[in-house]
Amino acid sequence: MGSSDETIFDLPPYIKVFKDGRVERLHSSPYVPPSLNDPETGGVSWKDVPISSVVSARIYLPKINNHDEKLPIIVYFHGAGFCLESAFKSFFHTYVKHFVAEAKAIAVSVEFRLAPENHLPAAYEDCWEALQWVASHVGLDISSLKTCIDKDPWIINYADFDRLYLWGDSTGANIVHNTLIRSGKEKLNGGKVKILGAILYYPYFLIRTSSKQSDYMENEYRSYWKLAYPDAPGGNDNPMINPTAENAPDLAGYGCSRLLISMVADEARDITLLYIDALEKSGWKGELDVADFDKQYFELFEMETEVAKNMLRRLASFIK
């Protein structure tokens, strides 16, 4: 084997990293282009917009019947280990468009930089930048587009900023957690905007449990964290991945008043329960809703099945 073929990280069937810096993503869903009036979702439209030189987003708008109506706005962070997939690819896109149709909400799905080409905290910073960009639309009207060319008319016309939500799955839910911690300390748009609530589906944390974890949890979860943030202070006990670590910020400081946390039927459930317990003991004063699905993580994204549709309705009901 030549030196150029020597691997330093191999997690089949998803990703392989070579010693010379090359990255092979072995399993990826296809790109989906922007579209208007999608017939599969009753008229959901989506488009892609730049936010900065390194951050962009896909914005979704459900079919509008009343142009004076204001809709909840959701900022979505996708999962897949901080290092796979995209806001523009079918795996997460298909689910988001169906969620938008069910919840009748605007969604901003953030395209952040991936590891290992861009190690954490790059994705955390990108998602915060995207959230601040969304918040910058508050108080604007359509005439603002003449002078604010970086703003989006769908958000200006239809977003109800009193119903701003975050939403993420797996590592995306981890980004939601860290964004909530940050929003409890730093203001959005100078304090003009507050996050009402957040959905954390299958949140990705590394919290020590008393139960025996599977090889998947022990190896794959920890491997993704090491790949994404190899120099993380504290390693697996870094507060960004372990919210119960000694030096972790107080969960009572979450910058929202409503939370939906969902679990599925695998070994990560024990970790999620410990996270919920820590949140409840923190004294956080918000409304907590827990969805305990007797299913597997990937079933949520198989939108042709009744299982996925029922799970989607449960999560979307939190927004509605």
UniProtKB/Swiss-Prot annotation:
Pfam families (alphabetical): Abhydrolase_3
Residue ranges of the motif Involved in the stabilization of the negatively charged intermediate by the formation of the oxyanion hole: 78-80
UniProt effect for mutating residue 266 to N: Normal activity
Top-level taxon of the source organism: Eukaryota
GO molecular function ontology, one term from the record: isomerase activity
Task of the protein: Component of iboga and aspidosperma monoterpenoid indole alkaloids (MIAs, e.g. tabersonine and catharanthine) biosynthesis pathway from 19E-geissoschizine, psychoactive compounds likely to be used in the treatment of opioid dependence. Catalyzes the conversion of dehydrosecodine to tabersonine, a precursor of vindoline; this process starts with the conversion of dihydroprecondylocarpine acetate to dehydrosecodine.
Family: Belongs to the 'GDXG' lipolytic enzyme family.
Name of protein: Tabersonine synthase
Record organism: Catharanthus roseus (Madagascar periwinkle)
Lineage: Eukaryota, Viridiplantae, Streptophyta, Embryophyta, Tracheophyta
Gene: TS
